[in-house]
Structures are given as structure tokens and as C-alpha cells.
Amino acid sequence: MDMQQAIRAVTQRIDLSEQEMTAVMGLIMNGEATPAQMGGFLVGLAMKGETVDEVTAAARVMRDLATRVEVQAGHLVDTCGTGGDASGSFNISTASALVVAAAGGRVAKHGNRSVSSKSGSADVLEAAGVNLDLSPEQVARCIEQVGVGFLFAPKHHGAMKHAVGPRREMGVRTLFNVLGPLTNPAGAPNQVLGVFSNRWLEPLARVLGRLGSRHVMVVHAEDGLDEISIGAPTRVAELRDGEVTVRLIAPEDFGMERADLSRIRVEDAAGSLAMIRGVLDGQPGPARDIVLLNAGAALYVADVAGSHAEGIEMAREAINSGAAAEKLQQLVSFTASC
């Protein structure tokens, strides 16, 4: 299937097979599609609605082209979300990653600089003094020795350079907004994946199942947050051993009070880092609570904790003991030595 055939199909609302989507993504990622063809296809696909087959095929192509990080899969988890929730919140998943590592998990944290948010995971880690310019081998050693490593997306997904311009110029959400969290270069089999819309909950859980993931929670909160929220109930699609179940969870299920999201908003990476340091230092409040909710979920899917509630208690202990604050310093020190 060539690009013109693909554009005709999606604009007529015809779904592509996995084989057809694989061919089209190959053209895009190898730079053989023009910017106009890429834009036309991605917008047409979005208006039709991407299927599980199409997203699975696209993610496989990206995974095959990625520069891999070779680490053992045991208790390995990613806390990468789609972003795009426009909440202005601090970097919750980045803080969670540090707490998870301090509690005994192993985190391959996939992320990038900010596109639409006040601060991306790369921005806040750089502000903390973390060196992002690591080779895949150095990232692997970081995960093994520190318990958490940052997989800076541009270093691992070089083929994405062909899509950067058209994506920026279109200014609308497309397939690429959800592909990032599906293409962890370390192949983390466990994941807490926040999405910007309920529409993606079950489909992405099923896609990750097809891609070989073991235990995943795909989450979207009723207040719009692409995390497990402290401000509202959160809908969860949980993939475990090939089965997907959907449920609603709320802060009060775990003995926490709801809080307005305005209390966790920041203006920039420096503000996000200050809030993260406060959480890691044990300051009580909604920022700490939302990190506990999300870190607890990551410890649960990584099979470090037997339940979400147990994961929250393990995360709480990692903060109270000082291990979480120490973990950030260990990450800074290790990457500085590379």
C-alpha cells in the first residue's frame, strides 16, 4: 500500500489491516512520505478513528526502529503518559518514578521535553542536574545500579525526525500522540500509562497486550488529568495476563482527601522541581498524595506490591525513610559520571 492509497482509504473511513499499516508507517518513518502526504494521512486516520490493529502495527514499526536499551525485565516498569491534558500540573510521573525506584521497583522512564505542558520530564530532570546525554549502554547501567534510568526519546527514536515538522505544523492530536508511551526502548513489560481521553483507555490496554506487555494500568481522570488524580475519580483499564478489566477508583478508596488541581499547578520546570523536592522530602499535601497514588500503582503493576493499596504504603515508606530523596541524588551523581 502506498501513501495515496492509504489516504484514500482513511478518508473513506476504511480501516487498514496490520499489514497495510505496517507498510504505511514504514514509508513515514523512513522519510519516503512527503509532509503533505503525512499530514493528510494522519488527520484522515484521526477523523476515522484509529483501530487497535492500526495502533499495534504502528507501534511495532517504531519499536523495531528504536535504539534499544538492554536490561533485565524483572520488576521493570515505565510511568510515561501521553501528555496533552493541559492541566499545568508538576511532573507527577517523574516524581513517581523516583519513589518507585526507592521502594524496590526498576524504572525505565521514557520521556521527552515539553510539547504543550509547562514542563516535560526531560526539562525537570535537567533542571535537577540529571545528564540526559547517555548512551543506551549507560542508561542500562543506570537502571541496574540506581534503579531508575531516563530514556530520552530523541536519543532512541531517530526515525521520528521525519514526523516532527508535520506534527508541529498540524497542531492537532494524531496517532503520534499515543505512540510514545507504547514504544519504550527498554521494552518495559509493566506500565502505568496516562492518556488524555477516555477513548484511548481500553484500546491502548489491548494494544499493549498485543505487544507483549504483562501488567498495565491505562488511566484517565474525570477532571481530565492523564494520571491517577487526587481531584476526581479515575477510570482505569487494567491489563493483566492478557485480560482487560475497566473500573473506577477514587482518592477516598485509599484514605485520601480530594484536592483541587490548582494546588499542584506550576509555571515551569523550576516550579515543578521545587514541588517534586517537597514531595520527596515528605511535605504533606495533595502533591505528595497524588505521587503516592501513581507510584503505588506502578509498584503494583511491577509486581513489587501485591495490590495498589500495598503499593501506596510502600511508596509512603520510601518517602518517609528518605530513600526517595536520596534516589534523585543518586540519579544525578550517576549520570554526571557518565
From Swiss-Prot:
GO terms for cellular component: cytosol. InterPro entries: Anthranilate_Pribosyl_Tfrase, Glycosyl_Trfase_fam3, Glycosyl_Trfase_fam3_N_dom, Glycosyl_Trfase_fam3_N_dom_sf, Nuc_phospho_transferase. It catalyses: N-(5-phospho-beta-D-ribosyl)anthranilate + diphosphate = 5-phospho-alpha-D-ribose 1-diphosphate + anthranilate. The keyword Mitochondrion does not apply. Binds 2 magnesium ions per monomer. Its EC number is 2.4.2.18. Anthranilate 1 binds at residues 81, 112. Belongs to the anthranilate phosphoribosyltransferase family. NCBIfam families: trpD. This is Anthranilate phosphoribosyltransferase. It comes from Thioalkalivibrio sulfidiphilus (strain HL-EbGR7). The lineage of its organism: Bacteria, Pseudomonadati, Pseudomonadota, Gammaproteobacteria, Chromatiales. The gene is trpD.
